[in-house]
Amino acid sequence: MVTTTAENEVLTSTSAVTGLPQKRYYRQRAHSNPIADHCFDYPARPEDVDWRSLYPSIRADQEVSFADIGCGYGGFLVTLGELFPEKISIGMEIRVKVSDYVLDRITALRQKSSGTGAYQNIACLRTNAMKYLPNYFRKGQLEKMFFLYPDPHFKRAKHKWRIINQALLSEYAYVLRKGGLVYTMTDVEDLHNWIVTHMDEHPLYERLDEEEANTDPITPKLYQSSEEGAKVVRNKGDHFLAIFRRL
């Protein structure tokens, strides 16, 4: 990607220091309307997904195990790839420029670590997870799902757009294996209470107690691995964590 200034000065989107794409060339609105009729290419069924186009080194016996829903700029997705090199993780993001950034970031990381095999286990899809999740994953495929700092949709009329609701929780339960985990983190207490209430009311989930949640090796990474989480830490904001097990 290349940007031309008013003085016809050409600026590449890649940092000469880090070799990674720079977010300022991929700016977009903080949120996107998930109900709007965006144009997406999506498979008719999970068997039709060409995973090798996203993971060139994937083995025939491997499949996506972790899904970061609304992955943003990919900070936590990259962390997942480093923490679990044997697992295949996917980030799903609805915003086009943001997903472009994540794809370019992964490409740059793979090039920087060429020969090591690092970051071959992560990828990003631009899609609407609120509509097309079962088109990508078969029943009981996923081990872990992450919903980190989702759009709170503060207005009551827009609560139906929240990514955690009763109808969608049933879809998540469909693609999540028994014993699988759903990780949620937000800096908005009202949204946290909404999430806990809806998941507690759903018969296919139970919340992990505080001790079990805090001893999960992923938990410390939830706070500031993502760009949103890091911003909350910088601003000395609150974090509200809840982890649920698929029954």
From Swiss-Prot:
Pathway: tRNA modification; N(7)-methylguanine-tRNA biosynthesis. Keywords: Methyltransferase, Nucleus, RNA-binding, S-adenosyl-L-methionine, Transferase, tRNA processing, tRNA-binding. It holds the Pfam family Methyltransf_4. Disulfide bonds: none annotated. GO terms for molecular function: tRNA (guanine(46)-N7)-methyltransferase activity; tRNA binding. It comes from the Eukaryota. It is found in: Nucleus. One of its GO terms (cellular component) is nucleus. Gene3D superfamilies: Vaccinia Virus protein VP39 (3.40.50.150). Its EC number is 2.1.1.33. PROSITE patterns: SAM_MT_TRMB. The active site is at 151. It catalyses: guanosine(46) in tRNA + S-adenosyl-L-methionine = N(7)-methylguanosine(46) in tRNA + S-adenosyl-L-homocysteine. Catalyzes the formation of N(7)-methylguanine at position 46 (m7G46) in tRNA. HAMAP family: tRNA_methyltr_TrmB_euk (MF_03055). Belongs to the class I-like SAM-binding methyltransferase superfamily. TrmB family. NCBIfam families: tRNA (guanosine(46)-N7)-methyltransferase TrmB. This is tRNA (guanine-N(7)-)-methyltransferase. It comes from Drosophila pseudoobscura pseudoobscura.
